[in-house]
Every structure is written in C-alpha cells, then in structure tokens.
C-alpha cells in the first residue's frame, strides 16, 4: 500500500494539545437496552467528513475519562469522534483492566457476542442517519477492543481504515500461555470449562463465562480478511499481550502478499505505549490521523 510506510515514519514526529471534553448521549438498542455514547467533534461539525468510532476495551471505565479525549487530541484531525461505552458502564467510572470491580450487571453482559451485536447496531444506525456523508469511516480499538474492531471491520463494507493499539493476532489462550506458561493457562482453562456460564467465579479479574467466550478466538483471521488500511501500534515491553502476536499479523500478511497492514513497535513501551516518560500513544495516533487526513492511507 502506497501510504503505510510513509505514515509509519510520520508517526515519530508530532506536537500535542490539551485534551478536549466529550459530550454525552444515550443510545437505545433495538432490544430496549441502553449505553452511553461519548462524542467529540474537532473542526466545523457541518463540514467534517471523517467519522471515528471506538468501543470499550477490558473493564468498565467510562471512555470519556481518558480514551476518547486522548484519541481526538492524538489524531488531531477534523473529525467526529464517537465512543460507545459497554452497557452498564457508570458515568465517570474509572476502573482497571479486569471486571472484578464492575457491577454484576456489567459482568453478566460483558461477552463477545454482545459486544459485536451492540457495536454493529450502533455503527449501522449512526451511518444510516447521514447516508453518503462520510469520506472516511475509521474504527479504533485498544487492547481487547482491537480484536473487536478487526472483527467488526471484517463484517462490514463501509469501514475505510482500522487503527489498533496493543492487540495482535493471537488468541487469548496463546497470549497468556506466552506470558504465564502453558501449564498455568491449561490448568485455569480446565476449571473454566467446568463452569463455563459462571458470572461469579473469577480468573485474572474476569468471570469464567467471559473467558469461555473469548479464549480461543484468534484475531489473525480477521486481519487477513481485510483489504482496508490497517495500522497497529505496540509496546515492545507490553506485559498484557506479547509483541510477538503483532509481529505475527505482519508476517502472515506479507506471506499472503498483502501490503495493507503496518506495524509500529515502540522500544521499551508498555501496553499503553508509554515508555520512561514518553507518550508514544499520542505519537502513534498523530501519525495515523495525518495519514488518513492526507489520503496517504487510501
């Protein structure tokens, strides 16, 4: 792809601004359930032609607290940025990567089949409200949300770009086996498989039913099915997802003759692309945003 490699270079050269504030609305799903939507518009609301969607990663943090403002300020392009919180996320809530501190209602709903259905409905109805308006429709996913973004992008024909932070092509089983050892993971899996519907029994901060539904999906198949531009940002010292899983996406794409996927690995950086006081996350987002706005990722 003509623009991927130029954008990877541009990603390293970026100044920053203060974070924008998100507006809030409530989205009502076809089944009657609701979730909060956070929105930031950069530029003239009537003129912007880029729409950026993002969805929750692991846990129940309100995306307006950090992720959406960071995304909008980091990409720094005229666009409408929309974040769909998972159902049962409390406004203003801040919480770490697990779901053990989340409500029982959240844990009961926090399953991949629900994420996929909710995100698809939200994207479809948002696009249908203004048909033909958007030149660029971008999905951005971080961590667990990266795998979902890749799956949603694969399921649709109206997404133009995919940006992923901190997620690669391996399944959770393979990620955790690499980080913790296969014996530890297999022992945990045996107990999970005995109680696959439990929302009370927890492992690593998540209910067994969450693990049972997520353990063996490998996002690699979704990445390889995509023809749109994809950029993945990764920390070399990510302790949540091995960097090797991101390298596997690039290796498999090249082996398949695909040139639409780019990877940036930041030396010494963690799962959030932070390294010894350096905020590589914003660098990464800025380069991706400039590539989209300039057309070099088309």
Predicted features and spans:
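Hydrolase active-site cap/lid region
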Residues: 155-202
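Short beta-strand/loop motif that positions the catalytic acidic residue
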Residues: 226, 232-234, 238
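Catalytic active-site module of serine/aspartate enzymes centered on a nucleophile-bearing elbow/loop
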Residues: 267-298
């Amino acid at each position: 792809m003509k623009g991927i490699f130029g954008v990877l270079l541009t990603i390293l050269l970026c100044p920053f601004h203060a974070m924008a504030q998100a507006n809030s609305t409530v989205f009502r799903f076809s089944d009657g359930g609701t979730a909060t939507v956070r929105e930031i518009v950069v530029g003239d609301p009537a003129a912007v032609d880029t729409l950026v969607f993002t969805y929750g990663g692991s846990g129940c943090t309100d995306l307006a607290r950090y992720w959406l403002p960071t995304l909008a300020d980091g990409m720094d392009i005229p666009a409408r940025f929309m974040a769909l919180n998972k159902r049962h996320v409390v406004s203003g809530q801040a919480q770490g990567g697990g779901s053990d501190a989340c409500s029982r209602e959240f844990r009961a709903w926090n399953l991949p089949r629900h994420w996929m259905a909710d995100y698809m409905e939200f994207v479809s109805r948002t696009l249908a409200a203004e048909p033909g308006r958007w030149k660029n429709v971008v999905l951005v996913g971080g961590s667990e949300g990266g795998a979902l973004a890749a799956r949603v992008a694969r399921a649709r024909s109206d997404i133009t770009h995919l940006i992923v932070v901190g997620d690669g092509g391996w399944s959770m089983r393979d990620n955790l086996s690499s980080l913790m050892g296969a014996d530890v993971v297999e022992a945990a899996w045996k107990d999970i498989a005995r109680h696959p519907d439990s929302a009370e029994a927890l492992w690593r901060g998540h209910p067994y039913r969450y693990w049972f539904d997520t353990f063996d999906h490998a996002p690699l198949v979704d990445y390889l099915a995509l023809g749109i531009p994809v950029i993945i940002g990764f920390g070399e010292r990510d302790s949540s997802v091995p960097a090797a899983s991101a390298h596997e996406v690039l290796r498999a794409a090249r082996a398949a003759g695909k040139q639409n996927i780019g990877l940036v690995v930041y030396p010494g950086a963690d799962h959030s692309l932070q390294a010894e006081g350096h905020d590589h996350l914003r660098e990464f987002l800025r380069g991706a945003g400039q590539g989209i706005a300039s057309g070099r990722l088309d």
